Swiss-Prot record:
Organism: Aspergillus fumigatus (strain ATCC MYA-4609 / CBS 101355 / FGSC A1100 / Af293)
Keyword annotations from UniProtKB, A to Z: Activator, Cytoplasm, DNA-binding, Metal-binding, Nucleus, Repeat, Repressor, Transcription, Transcription regulation, Virulence, Zinc, Zinc-finger
Motif range (YPX[LI] motif 1): 459-462
The protein's name in its UniProt record: pH-response transcription factor pacC/RIM101
Chain intervals with Polar residues compositional bias: 425-445
PTM info: Activated by C-terminal proteolytic cleavage by signaling protease (probably palB/RIM13) at neutral to alkaline ambient pH. Two consecutive proteolytic steps are required for pacC activation. The primary step is pH dependent, mediated by the putative calpain protease palB, to yield a 53-kDa form, pacC53. PacC53 is a transient intermediate, committed to proteolysis by the proteasome, generating a 27-kDa form of pacC. The truncated form pacC27, containing the DNA-binding region, is required for correct regulation of acid- and alkaline-expressed genes in response to alkaline pH.
Motif YPX[LI] motif 2: where in chain: 660-663
Spans annotated as Disordered: 1-55, 380-545, 605-676
Feature: compositional bias, Basic and acidic residues: 506-531, 605-615, 623-640
Its biological purpose: pH-responsive transcription factor required for epithelial invasion and pathogenicity in leukopenic mice. Modulates expression of genes encoding secreted enzymes, as well as cell wall and gliotoxin biosynthetic activities, during invasive aspergillosis. Plays a role in zinc homeostasis and represses the expression of the zinc-uptake transporters zrfA, zrfB and zrfC under zinc-limiting conditions in a pH-dependent manner. Binds to the pH response DNA consensus sequence 5'-GCCARG-3' or PR site in target genes promoters.
InterPro entries: pacC/RIM101 (IPR050806), Znf_C2H2_sf (IPR036236), Znf_C2H2_type (IPR013087)
Gene Ontology terms: cellular component: cytoplasm; nucleus
Length: 676
């Protein structure tokens, strides 16, 4: 009886699984005929759910198998065959295959077995360098060592990776990324090591967007932000929405960064003397590149090196730095004006450019300051052109020769009072004795003529001191005495030599006999004898004519159309001159802004003092050596601690007691002579 009960119990326990599992496929079998009538799969197999540990193990195994394949390395049991012509060697990995091809089949020039033609399969690509053929071989070998930091995709060649990275980049990434080769994006953003995947990097675009991945919080180069904060929910990163005015701030940063870089490059060209500082055309062309940019210094005040950026809004439980103020971005320091010496040199170069702009021949001549062709500079100006003296003398020069006070108060040639005159008079004009040389005569006196007792008509008298005496003596005004430091006045007016390249008016023709004064009828009154202006104009067909063969055809106007054409030409020339003047003013203002910026940095001490200290320390021995003007070679030896601690008197005694006492005595005599 008990055995029967045990058997029944065992039967019930064995039947219980089927009994419990049997009702489950019933609803499935009712739904399947409508969509899959031929499905006869047993229910327990299709509805079984594996445990979580089994799923994790399978995923890990799949990742372990797929990772080597992504990098181009096959499993250990798989061999890679070399398909080079005439080679059947097998390599365990793609890297080994690549090394085999480079060393065995390509070879090297040093070993005299260099092969620049690819013989992989049917490929017959030929290159000119070994680097090119080795780069081409990567196409055939499944080696992908270059991995994308954003999506994890691997590539065979670095240029392929570079093209792929551009697909991830947007405008904000291109602006924020530093110079090429400085740092890769993974080093700039330090959030990859905080538990997020390498593909979770998110670059905030210029427009409003919601990222699908976590935001790797970090600060790129020249950006400052608050310390990262781990969110409460570990499955989500910090997600930021850009505000509506973020695009405007982004564009402002772009323009300022562009102008900042252009200004730094301009300072670098100045340091390296890339263009001629004394050429007006070269200076103007170089400044034109800066005028079209929005330089930060043109806004007034010192150059700002940081600007606030719009604060992002944090969502999803992340950390929002907006509550502590907007973060700021820092412009990189200018590498070409880091030290004090750089600032001083740049200021000197800018001054040379300023002198070149101010001394431009065209603008100085247009302003009436100097005319090309003559050796004269207006006395009222504080500068003169070095390459183009004026053509004609202004009225002030003629007046300067009439009186002593006017002529001596107007420094026409800018000559020193006790030095050699700027323009020495010719020997034929005036003759000086040793007592009456231009240097010995005081500037307060004038040259007085010598008094002769006998009236010798062979030599003319020198001009007298006053205007009345000179007129009474029969000498013209132009031949009056000039100051001893200036050119004599005998070459003025019409007797002065004409310079070439100038347009001169033709001499008018002789008067016609019909308009000459009639003196035959003496009995008539004056009104009848002398023709009036009206009669003279009516009697003549045309006014005083100038011979046509002496006039430039371009200056001859005989019809209204020619007059209109001349008027249009004059207007166009005026517009060109006005435009040139405005450009000249812009160049002058830009140079003034640049010099004020350099001066402000020098005043505030905004430069790297460490490099200046090193430079001065390195240059001090040379300066000290140049300062000793002894005239004999001196041997330099390192200074020991004993010599440093010794008093100056003991050093002097030791120096005088050694070597050359006689030479030191000579040096002392020379110093005494120099002081006297």
């Amino acid at each position: 009886m008990s055995e029967h009960q045990d058997t029944a119990t065992n039967n019930n326990t064995t039947a219980s699984p089927s009994a419990t599992a049997a009702p489950m496929p019933a609803p499935i079998s009712q739904e399947q005929p409508s969509s899959q009538p031929a499905a006869t799969t047993p229910a327990p197999v299709s509805t079984s759910t594996p445990p979580a540990s089994v799923t994790a193990t399978a995923a890990a195994a799949t990742a372990a198998v797929s990772a080597p394949q992504a990098n181009g390395t096959p499993p250990s049991d798989e061999q890679l065959s070399c398909l080079w012509q005439g080679c059947s060697e097998k390599c365990p990995s793609a890297e080994a295959l690549y090394d085999h091809i480079c060393e065995r089949h390509v070879g090297r020039k040093s070993t005299n077995n260099l092969n620049l033609t690819c013989q992989w399969g049917s490929c017959r690509t030929t290159t000119v360098k070994r680097d090119h053929i080795t780069s081409h071989i990567r196409v055939h070998v499944p080696l992908k060592p270059h991995k994308c930091e954003f999506c994890g995709k691997a590539f065979k060649r670095p240029q392929d990776l570079k093209k792929h990275v551009k697909t991830h980049a947007d405008d904000s990434v291109l602006v924020r990324s530093p110079e090429p080769g400085a740092r890769n994006p993974d080093m700039m953003f330090h959030g990859a090591g905080k538990g997020y995947a390498a593909a979770a990097h998110y670059f905030e675009p210029s427009l409003n967007a919601v990222p699908s991945q976590g935001y790797a919080h970090g600060a790129p180069q020249y950006y400052s932000s608050h310390p990262p904060h781990q969110p409460s929910n570990p499955s989500y990163g910090n997600v930021y929405y850009a505000l509506n005015h973020g695009h405007d701030g982004h564009a402002s940063y772009e323009s300022k960064k562009r102008g900042y870089d252009a200004l730094n490059e301009f300072f670098g060209d100045l340091k390296r003397r890339q263009f001629d500082l004394h050429s007006y055309a070269a200076v103007g062309q170089r400044l034109l590149g800066l005028q079209n940019l929005s330089l930060p210094i043109l806004t007034g005040g010192p150059l700002p090196e940081y600007q606030p950026m719009p604060a992002p809004v944090a969502v999803g439980g992340g950390y929002g730095p907006g509550g502590h103020g907007a973060p700021v971005y820092h412009l990189p320091p200018m590498s070409n004006i880091r030290t004090k010496n750089d600032l001083i040199n740049i200021d000197q170069f800018l001054q040379q450019m300023q002198d070149t702009i101010y001394e431009n021949d065209d603008h100085v001549a247009a302003a009436g300051v100097a005319q090309p062709g003559a050796h004269y500079v207006h006395g009222g100006m504080s500068y003169r052109t070095t390459h183009s003296p004026p053509t004609q003398l202004p009225p002030s020069h003629a007046v300067a020769t009439t009186s002593a006070s006017t002529s001596m108060s107007n420094p026409a040639t800018h000559s020193p009072p006790t030095g050699t005159p700027a323009l020495t008079p010719p020997s034929s004009a005036q003759s000086y004795t040793s007592a009456r040389s231009p240097i010995s005569i005081s500037s307060a006196h004038r040259v007085s003529p010598p008094h002769h007792d006998g009236g010798s008509g062979m030599y003319p008298r020198l001009p007298s001191t006053t205007m009345a005496d000179s007129l009474a003596g029969g000498y013209p005004t132009a031949s009056s005495a000039a100051p001893p430091s200036t050119l004599s006045g005998i070459f003025d007016d019409d007797r002065r030599r004409y310079t070439g390249g100038t347009l001169q008016r033709a001499r008018p023709e002789e008067r016609r006999p019909s308009i000459q004064m009639d003196t035959s009828h003496d009995g008539k009154e004056d009104g009848e004898r002398t023709p009036t202006g009206k009669a003279r104009s009516s009697g003549s067909d045309s006014p005083v004519r100038i011979s046509a063969n002496l006039i430039d055809p371009a200056l001859h106007s005989s019809s209204p159309s020619d007059a209109e054409a001349a008027l249009r030409t004059a207007q166009a020339a005026t517009e060109v001159a006005d435009r040139a003047d405005s450009q000249w003013v812009e160049k002058v203002r830009l140079l003034e802004y640049l010099r004020s910026y350099i001066a402000s940095r020098l005043e505030r001490g905004e430069y790297d003092s460490d490099s200046d200290d090193h430079a001065s320390a390195a240059a001090s021995p040379v300066i000290k050596h140049d300062g000793h003007m002894d005239g004999v070679e001196s041997s330099h030896k390192p200074i020991t601690a004993e010599e440093t601690s010794a008093p100056p008197a003991a050093k002097a005694e030791s120096n005088h007691g050694v070597m050359y006492p006689t030479l030191h005595g000579l040096d002392g005599d020379e110093d005494t002579k120099m002081h006297h």
